[in-house]
Structures are given as structure tokens and as C-alpha cells.
């Protein structure tokens, strides 16, 4: 698949922008702060409905504007889908597919697949567990858009349960073990059922990612250093070896029961997929805290490449977005990454200067300055 056209209105620094793109490599060159990242961010937003840079949509709207609009033409299996997203901070975002007004946001999820490489990826290794949970969940949703609904349902249950626990803590009800809160049992069951579905999907995904990430890490580093991905479940101290949903429901039920006294005291849910982590190991040591800067970069890139290979195996090459990544890498890692990604159907690269882009990634070149984009001839 590839994006053939991108149009922006009041998105970030762009009052208006229109790009014609093509398969292969396209490079966007310009000084920092001129809007290069905004372009790949917009394409990523079409795929995931989220930004890799900010947690909320408000910064995506140009200062002084009420809304932002992204329009993208996505070519897949010879067919073109026209996607329009209207970003409305403080209100519901809106979507159109092939100009139809009767389109829900979830209807356009899964049409465009992207894999983004960005300086923020270092947080996959060095950051908090939330970064790694987001990595897994975004990949799950890209492969099976219905998981967007599962995640939304889980977050709704979690919010309601936390509100109940917070109220119980304020009333000092923990000494009664929650007997005055019969609805807590109801929310426990909801959390166990929906949480088990999300947990099973994550566990299966990690099992698929493991060999692909190990292969990619070896190719990026030219070493035999072993890496392993281990899913750390907050409901048990043991490493889970099952994706059987009924078994996972029972594990979560038991963990919620054990945690109830502490949860009632603290007023917050302490067990569930929202507290889990994807632990990254290198040479039988936790990568977080032990891996060097170069090893951490290679690990983060290996995770992204593993995600790319999974999406490719599902039937389509995702669009690769490389945002100022090469400036962070030494010459050998640049060369190895470029050799790996150039086989993709479409690769979009941003860089401050042309020398940051490896020669292996030659193709169309755009100059980005002051919120305008022009193709070099």
C-alpha cells in the first residue's frame, strides 16, 4: 500500500498543504522546526488516530483555527480509498471515507498501515511501561481494528471502577472489605472478562514478535547477542504460558480478590492490563538500565521492524515513516537500517540535512521551509 496524495488544512504549522506522493522513497529535507515531522505525523494519525508526539489532539490544530483536517488517498490492492479526518479538540472527531458522511472514526481504522521510526522510540526501551503497552496495543489495532473497541471498553470499565474505589477510600470503607460496595463485584467481573481478552491478544502478539525482533536486532548489529521479550502480568508473579481466555479470566478474578484490600485503601485499580509491562532483555539482563545508547536504539528499531514484518505478513507492506532517525545512528547502523527498509513499497524520510540520509535511500526529494513543501526537480 502507499499514500498517493496528502492534503492538510490548519494542521500544526500548515494553513494549507497538498502533496503528491508515489511508491518508493520520498525524503523531506529542512531545518528543525520547519514542519517536516508534522507531515509524517499526519500520515501516522490517519493510520492510528493518535500522535506519537502528544497525548491529546489540541496541539494538532493550527493556532487560531477551530479544527484541523487531514485528507489522504490510500492505494491498496489497486483500489484507492479517500480518507478525511476532521480533528475537533473538545468535541468528537469526524471521519469520511470516499466522501461518505456516514462514516465513524473506527470505520477508517485498518485501511492505512504505518510503521513509524522516531527519536521518541528510545522510550520503548528506556521509558515507562505505558510506552511499551502503547506499542503493543497500536500494533494489535493495526492488525485487527476491533481491538480499538476492546481497549475503549476496558478503559471505560477501569474509569468506573477507579471512581468507585476512590469513593470507597474517601469513606474509609477498606476495613469492611468492600462488603458495602456490591457494585464492585460487578466491575471486577467486567474488568476480568474484557481484560482477559486484551491480555490474551497481547500475549499472542509478543510470541509472534519475539523471533522477528531477535532476527532484526541481529541484522542491525551484526552480533549474536540474544534478546527476549517477556510479558509481565500484574495479576501474577509467574510468567504466563497460556492465551486461553477462560484461564486468564480466572487469573484476573483471583488477583482482583487478593488486591481488594489495598485497592480500597488506595482508591485505585492495581491489577489488570493497564499495569502490565513488556520486559525487554538483552544478554539475560534487563535492557532498561543495562543497554548502552547504541544497543537501546538497535533494540527499539528491532521492535519497530518486527511490527513491520508482522503487518507485511498479513498481506500488505505498511508505509514506513522515518522521522529524523538517521541523525541518531552511527554510520554502520544507518547503512543496515537503510538496507532493511528500502524493500518496503513506500518509505517517507525526514532529515535536517541531505547528508543524514543514506545513499541507499535515494528517491523523490522535497524541501520543507516555513510551513511550505516543494518538490525538488
UniProtKB/Swiss-Prot annotation:
<keyword id="KW-0227">DNA damage</keyword>
<keyword id="KW-0547">Nucleotide-binding</keyword>
<comment type="similarity">
    <text>Belongs to the RecF family.</text>
</comment>
<feature type="binding site">
    <location>
        <begin position="30"/>
        <end position="37"/>
    </location>
    <ligand>
        <name>ATP</name>
    </ligand>
</feature>
<dbReference type="GO" id="GO:0006260">
    <property type="term" value="P:DNA replication"/>
</dbReference>
<protein>
    <recommendedName>
        <fullName>DNA replication and repair protein RecF</fullName>
    </recommendedName>
</protein>
<dbReference type="GO" id="GO:0009432">
    <property type="term" value="P:SOS response"/>
</dbReference>
<keyword id="KW-0234">DNA repair</keyword>
<dbReference type="GO" id="GO:0006302">
    <property type="term" value="P:double-strand break repair"/>
</dbReference>
<dbReference type="InterPro" id="IPR003395">
    <property type="entry name" value="RecF/RecN/SMC_N"/>
</dbReference>
<dbReference type="InterPro" id="IPR018078">
    <property type="entry name" value="DNA-binding_RecF_CS"/>
</dbReference>
<dbReference type="InterPro" id="IPR001238">
    <property type="entry name" value="DNA-binding_RecF"/>
</dbReference>
<keyword id="KW-0963">Cytoplasm</keyword>
<dbReference type="GO" id="GO:0003697">
    <property type="term" value="F:single-stranded DNA binding"/>
</dbReference>
<dbReference type="GO" id="GO:0005737">
    <property type="term" value="C:cytoplasm"/>
</dbReference>
<dbReference type="GO" id="GO:0000731">
    <property type="term" value="P:DNA synthesis involved in DNA repair"/>
</dbReference>
<keyword id="KW-0067">ATP-binding</keyword>
<keyword id="KW-0742">SOS response</keyword>
<dbReference type="GO" id="GO:0005524">
    <property type="term" value="F:ATP binding"/>
</dbReference>
<keyword id="KW-0238">DNA-binding</keyword>
<dbReference type="InterPro" id="IPR027417">
    <property type="entry name" value="P-loop_NTPase"/>
</dbReference>
<dbReference type="Pfam" id="PF02463">
    <property type="entry name" value="SMC_N"/>
</dbReference>
<dbReference type="InterPro" id="IPR042174">
    <property type="entry name" value="RecF_2"/>
</dbReference>
<keyword id="KW-0235">DNA replication</keyword>
<comment type="function">
    <text>The RecF protein is involved in DNA metabolism; it is required for DNA replication and normal SOS inducibility. RecF binds preferentially to single-stranded, linear DNA. It also seems to bind ATP.</text>
</comment>
